[in-house]
Design a protein with these regions (language model features):
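Sigma70-family region 2
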Residues: 13-14, 40, 53-68, 87-88
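Short, hydrophobic secondary-structure boundary micro-motifs
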Residues: 20-22, 35, 64, 93-96
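Arg/Lys-rich amphipathic alpha helix in sigma70-family domain 2
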Residues: 61-65, 75-95
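Structural recognition of an alpha-helix C-terminal capping motif at a helix-to-coil junction
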Residues: 33, 47-54, 67-79
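Short, charged helix-capping/linker segments at alpha-helix termini
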Residues: 13-22, 32-51
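Internal acidic/polar
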Residues: 1-5, 91-101
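Hydrophobic side chains within well-formed alpha-helices
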Residues: 5-8, 19-20, 48, 69
């Protein structure tokens, strides 16, 4: 029988890394798909996906289960996408292509 997200989260909070790895396997594709839809670039979407799971792992002790794990994970991913978009808008002029004279 497959463990639920809630069971895997509880085990992960108890220090079971294998349970967190199961959550990654379960949610990696949907999180990547979300990041790709928002950002539109494969490499950057992969980075956001990886950062999402890193942030989730670090914040897991504070996860109280008031929302579904998937909702919490999607919110982390969307916040990281928003941060990525903001950084792109603030790219320095030196990174922009020069006009041909």
């Amino acid at each position: 029988m497959t463990a639920t997200d809630e069971e895997l989260v509880a085990r992960s909070q108890g220090g079971d890394l294998e349970s967190f790895n199961e959550l990654i396997v379960r949610w990696e594709r949907p999180i990547y798909a979300l990041a790709y839809r928002v950002i539109g670039r494969e490499e950057d979407a992969r980075d956001v996906c990886q950062d999402t799971f890193l942030r989730a792992y670090r914040a897991l002790p504070g996860f109280k289960g008031q929302a579904k794990f998937s909702s919490w994970l999607y919110r982390i991913a969307l916040n990281l996408c928003r941060d990525w978009i903001r950084r792109q808008r603030r790219a320095p002029v030196s990174q922009m292509p020069e006009d041909a004279d």
